[in-house]
Amino acid sequence: MNNKFKDFFGFGDNDSYEERDAYEEHYDEQEEMQNSNRPTNSRDSNVVSIKAGQAGSGPSKIVLYEPRVYSDAKEVAQNLLNQRAIIINFSRMDDASARRVVDFITGTVYALNGEIQRIGDKIFLATPPKFETDGKIT
């Protein structure tokens, strides 16, 4: 009778409580293992997709450039990375420097899967991948 009284008020045999605690510990360990295998979406991540800036809802833009020195090529390439088409006029640049800029922009266009076309004497059109050009200038 003494044991029934202890069991009724929870002071009796602790075997059932120990089994429940062991089950909960095992369950918690499994849950921690599953959570540790999930990829984290940290805001501190240093990896950024090139295509991250492509989802802009604003209108598409065409940027006009007349570079004078080779260092202007970096700004032109940055606009391509931002999904803007570019018309480049090399008439104010010597031929050797213009060739170097065209090579730099061609590499950028190739990396982005874009396109570059000569549309006039010393004038080029460079476009990111989602632009289409039709027609020819003669």
Swiss-Prot record:
InterPro entries: Cell_div_SepF, Cell_div_SepF/SepF-rel, SepF-like_sf. One of its GO terms (cellular component) is cytoplasm. Residues 1-59 are annotated as: Disordered. It is found in: Cytoplasm. Homodimer. Interacts with FtsZ. Cell division protein that is part of the divisome complex and is recruited early to the Z-ring. Probably stimulates Z-ring formation, perhaps through the cross-linking of FtsZ protofilaments. Its function overlaps with FtsA. This is Cell division protein SepF. It comes from Lactobacillus delbrueckii subsp. bulgaricus (strain ATCC 11842 / DSM 20081 / BCRC 10696 / JCM 1002 / NBRC 13953 / NCIMB 11778 / NCTC 12712 / WDCM 00102 / Lb 14). The lineage of its organism: Bacteria, Bacillati, Bacillota, Bacilli, Lactobacillales. The gene is sepF.
